Amino acid sequence: MEENNQIVEKITRIVNPFIEEMNLSLVDVEYVQDGGYWYVRIFIENLNGDLNIEDCSKLSSKIEDKVEELIEHKFFLEVSSPGLERPLKKLEDYTRFIGEKITLHLKHKLDDKKQFKTIIKEVNGDNIIFLMDKKEVEIKFNEIRKANILFEFNDF
């Protein structure tokens, strides 16, 4: 697993200059094995509007050879939008999505639970304030294992 993390870091360093050049934002990089096949998944977004297939294709073309030099075995490269239930990876993501419903997974239990459906209320330094059961709960960013925007069909 440590080796996978190192590869993700190297892929991130490869991708970042192209992301900046294309005026996009990197959401996440995954290097995973699924069903016997290896995948490099790069999730990007356009902060100035909708991400289109041309952006994904263009980035894929720019980085493909460099990523192939890094990984010795066969893999599939996927470049896409993070989707409706995008992950929140950086502290800035929480600021950007204040007021949104999310699924929150903590590293340690809080009230005998690690998983919550909550709303981002505020970001205060390295702490995020969530609205849980009509109460404000402050949690340090480094106590969050993972979080995703919560898409509920009935919101429409």
Curated annotation (Swiss-Prot):
CDD domains: YlxS_C. InterPro entries: Ribosome_maturation_RimP (IPR003728), RimP_C (IPR028998), RimP_C_sf (IPR036847), RimP_N (IPR028989), RimP_N_sf (IPR035956). Pfam families: DUF150_C (PF17384), RimP_N (PF02576). It is found in: Cytoplasm. Its main location: cytoplasm. GO terms for cellular component: cytosol. One of its GO terms (biological process) is ribosomal small subunit assembly. Keywords: Cytoplasm, Ribosome biogenesis. Required for maturation of 30S ribosomal subunits. PANTHER family: RIBOSOME MATURATION FACTOR RIMP. This is Ribosome maturation factor RimP. The lineage of its organism: Bacteria, Fusobacteriati, Fusobacteriota, Fusobacteriia, Fusobacteriales.
